[in-house]
UniProtKB/Swiss-Prot annotation:
GO terms for cellular component: cytosol; mitochondrion. Residues 277-543 form the FAD-binding FR-type domain. Pfam families: FAD_binding_1, Flavodoxin_1, NAD_binding_1. This is NADPH-dependent diflavin oxidoreductase 1. NADP(+) binds at T554, S607, R608, G613, G614, Y615, V616, Q617. Residues 33-58 have a biased composition (Polar residues). GO terms for molecular function: flavin adenine dinucleotide binding; FMN binding; NADP binding; NADPH-hemoprotein reductase activity; oxidoreductase activity. It comes from Yarrowia lipolytica (strain CLIB 122 / E 150) (Yeast). Signal peptide: none annotated.
């Protein structure tokens, strides 16, 4: 075991947002993962509720092989092949899958790392012999969007019980035990693979965001155990050894510059962004700050018009900017432009926005690495890692860095397992290598990168002898992920309306950090072109239910959409909270209008105002009779949306307390009632 821990490099403190993925309604709003919030987590089994995998029938869909695949490893032995499929929403499961792929390459396997949705049923049924699935759980037991396609196939009733009898498998899950269905997704997948005849190699691994130990430590330990089991099941031939961890593996996605071709101009980043193939196009029609000018938190009411025939980015026919500035009721904008929409949105739907690195940051990296002279030649990349929305064209080094490489994120330890090979200074090489080691190296890395929020670009420029071979660019730098936002407009209207908090803060080393997406978005002008993708993830139909909504901060965005769209005589209650009534009462005009129209019962909490009543959970307790009446007597729905951490846990504790005290129940009885709400889908929770 210790040999395998040393052989296969560990990984660093990972973005904890993976554990806070949204609940079964998929109301995504992960505004910025760069700079990344990273916390300690570990393996902790807390859920005892049995898992029942229910199969379903349906029409067969077309399944195609992924366009971008990991190339065959020259170090693999004939017939020694492993497929590692991941499902993720913030990238953590993908990072683990990539690390596991590298580890298996060192065991002389031909390793293929793919999204679950890119693993076709034909390939799974015929070509896969060893399978590992790495999957996070989205909120209350759901599988992420990029894994649902394969999961739906696996649930078909007509599948024979021996479909996967040729497959040896294991799984690894990422979860958060503060959710009632902790690691539910991976447990469902694991059980279903067994039902279809697959046999286990090694045990399933799980990590828990709520544990004091790091998920990286737990993952490393599980990986070592799995690799040990894998070697026992598939021993190496005599005379063939495992590839040492100190040896640099060949590039999986090699890149070279076509200097024999003309240079390409990709300086117009907005135009280049629109060359992605798998996106929708729109025009910015609103980018209004909705918090007070003197307030430290800049929140934007951001609007995108996609009202064009064939979505061809035609010029606007109205002066949306003037309409927005003249209207205190932001819903007026939606009503004014709803006719003729070519793209339809329902309450709960989300959009992905694609950030761009700044010109200054891109130029700095090009200068530091000596790539300026080759930055504008077209790239030759025989294989590309999969990416949502597709790649821009032409793909030059400049456009690749601008639109696709995450150079401003906090580096993970996997980054250092590559780059120490490329430093020419022995002292710098030794230091970089230390960051790639478990134990003290992990602690040093946390102090160096995570605590001060140091970016990849800063690391590269600080180690001046570090020169990354162009061939390894796609292996060394992580890909930028799109950021997901819930719509806030009334269903079936345009423009798309988003509520976005601009990320900007000072670190402990007195450096200003800005979110890549929100810095870019904050500077977009009216009329500017933008690309996005749409995710149809509507919440359940709540018109037949009384609803209590709890929404601090920008969590109010999907609540606004629900309130504007709701056509029901049922009771609608909102507990909204923020810091200051006069500075960040988001959507105040809309909410107060709904109150005046008898469509909403509104309770507010402003934590920094004197005598404001504190936080949303404190106001809920003051209204405990209402809470108990709606949730118990009227069998209503509770819908919680906002930042992760204390808020969702304290809201749940408050709900249990309200029900207990008003009904005269024991704590155990109230807890069982809330668990029943969670199981029946009447307790909806999204945090990030």
């Amino acid at each position: 075991m210790s040999f395998l821990l040393n052989l296969i490099p560990a990984i660093s403190h990972t973005n904890h947002d993976e554990m806070h993925e949204p609940n079964q309604t998929h109301l995504h709003r992960h505004a910025d993962t760069s700079p990344t919030n990273q916390h300690n987590t570990s393996h902790k089994m807390t859920t005892t509720e049995p898992i029942h995998v229910t199969t379903g029938s349906g029409e067969s869909r077309d399944h195609t092989e992924p366009r971008h695949v990991t190339p065959t490893s020259p170090n693999a032995l004939d017939g020694r092949r492993i497929t590692i499929a991941y499902a993720t929403e913030t990238g953590n499961a993908q990072d683990f899958a990539t690390l596991l792929g590298n580890a298996c390459t060192r065991l002389r396997f031909e390793s293929h790392v793919v999204q679950m949705n890119d693993l076709s049923p034909e390939t799974l049924a015929q070509d896969v012999s060893v399978l590992v699935i790495v999957c996070s759980t989205t909120g209350q037991g759901e599988i992420p969007l990029n894994g649902k396609k394969l999961w739906k196939f696996l649930l078909r009733k007509k599948l024979p019980p021996n479909l996967l009898s040729h497959v040896t498998f294991t799984t690894f899950g990422l979860g958060d035990s503060s959710y009632p269905r902790f690691n539910w997704a991976i447990r469902k997948i694991h059980k279903r693979l067994s039902q279809l005849g697959a046999s286990e190699v090694g045990s399933r691994g799980e990590c828990d965001d709520m544990s004091p130990d790091s998920i990286e430590t737990m993952y490393n330990e599980w990986q070592a155990r799995f690799c040990e089991s894998l070697l026992k099941a598939f021993p190496l031939p005599e005379g063939v050894e495992v590839i040492p961890g100190e040896k640099l593996l060949p590039a999986k996605f090699p890149v070279k510059v076509l200097t024999n071709k003309p240079k390409r101009d990709t300086s117009d980043a907005d135009h280049v962004a629109c060359t992605r193939k798998d996106v929708l196009q729109g025009t910015v029609v609103g980018n209004e700050r909705v918090t007070a000018k003197g307030h430290f938190q800049d929140v934007r009411f951001f609007q995108i018009d996609a009202n064009t025939e064939d979505n061809d980015m035609a010029d606007l026919s109205r002066d949306f900017s003037k309409l927005n500035s003249d209207s205190r009721d932001l819903h007026d904008v939606s009503r004014a432009v709803s006719a003729g929409s070519s793209i339809d949105f329902s309450t709960g739907d989300t959009v992905s926005l694609f950030p761009q690195n700044s010109v200054a940051d891109v130029d700095l990296l090009l200068r530091d690495q000596g790539w300026e002279d080759i930055a504008d030649y077209k790239l030759d990349a025989p294989s590309l890692p999969p990416i949502e929305g597709g790649y821009v064209t032409p793909l030059t080094l400049r456009s690749l860095i601008t639109h696709h490489l995450d150079i401003m994120g906090i580096p993970r330890q996997s980054f250092f397992t590559y780059v120490f090979h490329f430093a020419t200074s022995e002292r710098q090489k030794e230091r970089l290598q230390e960051f790639s080691q478990p134990g003290e190296g992990l602690e040093d890395l946390f102090d160096y990168a995570n605590r001060p929020r140091r970016s990849i670009l800063e690391v590269v420029t600080e180690f001046d002898s570090l020169k990354i071979p162009l061939k390894y660019v796609l292996d060394v730098f992580p890909l930028m992920r799109p950021r997901l936002f819930s719509i806030s407009q009334k269903a079936h209207t345009m423009p798309i309306q988003l509520c976005v908090a601009i990320v900007k803060y000072q670190t402990i080393i007195k450096r200003i950090r800005e979110g890549v997406l929100t810095r870019w978005l904050g500077g977009l002008a009216i009329g500017q072109k933008i690309v996005f993708t749409k995710h149809s993830t509507p919440i359940p139909d709540l018109d037949n239910y009384d609803v209590i909504m709890v929404a601090p901060g920008t969590g109010v965005a999907p609540m606004r959409s629900l309130i504007l769209s709701r056509e029901s005589e049922k009771e609608t209650v909102l507990f909204f909270g923020n810091r200051f009534r006069e500075k960040d009462f988001l959507f105040q005009a809309d909410l107060e209008k709904a109150v005046g129209d008898k469509k909403l019962n509104l309770f507010t909490s402003f934590s920094r105002d004197e005598n404001s009543g504190g936080y949303v959970q404190q106001e809920m307790y003051r209204q405990k009779e209402l809470v108990a009446r709606v949730l118990c007597s009227k069998q209503g729905v509770l819908y919680v949306c906002g930042s992760s951490g204390k808020m969702p846990r304290e809201v749940r504790i408050t709900v249990v307390t309200c029900i207990q005290e008003v009904n005269g129940w024991t704590e155990e009885q109230a807890e069982e009632w809330v668990k029943g709400m969670e199981k029946s889908g009447r307790y909806l929770q999204e945090t990030w």
